[in-house]
Swiss-Prot record:
It comes from Arabidopsis thaliana (Mouse-ear cress). GO terms for biological process: defense response. SUPFAM superfamilies: Bet v1-like. Gene3D superfamilies: 3.30.530.20. This is MLP-like protein 165. Belongs to the MLP family. InterPro entries: Bet_v_I/MLP, MLP-like_ligand-binding, START-like_dom_sf. SMART domains: Bet_v_1.
Length: 152
């Protein structure tokens, strides 16, 4: 199989730096969305490359966990990249990499754009592309945006 990729842009009202900073502090994300029930630090330090996180979430109405390693944090470009190490995704994908980049809007103005990108290699052709997971991240992003706006 070959590595494949899907992505989506989500327009938000929160500034790019503020959104990125909040996501980087993963332990606070469960406060902002009902989809994420917890995030535990298993190894390393919060918000540092090489750290391993255990996400507890609700996906398609079912509780799930995902053990991820932070591979990239770029404060200047507002990028965070996580590699899935363990969890349900590893049963269907040989590799799975999630990248979030927060940018200023293309046409200027307030707010920002969150680009979610997923690179993955399916175990076989019978495994679906992760479109539902991409939509999950759209919903999580919108809820976090609303939470951050309510804190201004």
């Amino acid at each position: 199989m070959i590595e494949e990729e899907i992505e989506v842009d989500v327009d938000i009202k929160t500034r790019a730096d503020k959104f990125h900073k909040f996501i980087r502090r993963s332990q606070h994300v469960p406060k902002a969305t009902h989809y994420i029930k917890g995030c535990d630090l298993l190894e390393g330090e919060w918000g540092k490359v090489g750290s391993i996180l255990l996400w507890k979430l609700v996906f398609d109405g079912e509780p799930r966990v995902s053990k991820d390693m932070i591979e990239v944090i770029d404060e200047e470009k507002n990028v965070i990249q996580l590699r899935v190490l363990e969890g349900p995704l590893k049963k269907e994908y040989k590799s799975f990499l999630k990248t979030m980049k927060v940018m200023s809007p293309k046409h200027g103005g307030p707010g920002s754009v969150v680009k979610w990108n997923m690179k993955y290699e399916r175990i076989d052709q019978n495994v679906d592309h992760p479109n539902r997971l991409l939509q999950f991240f759209v919903e999580v992003t919108k809820e976090i945006d609303q939470y951050l706006l309510s804190k201004d």
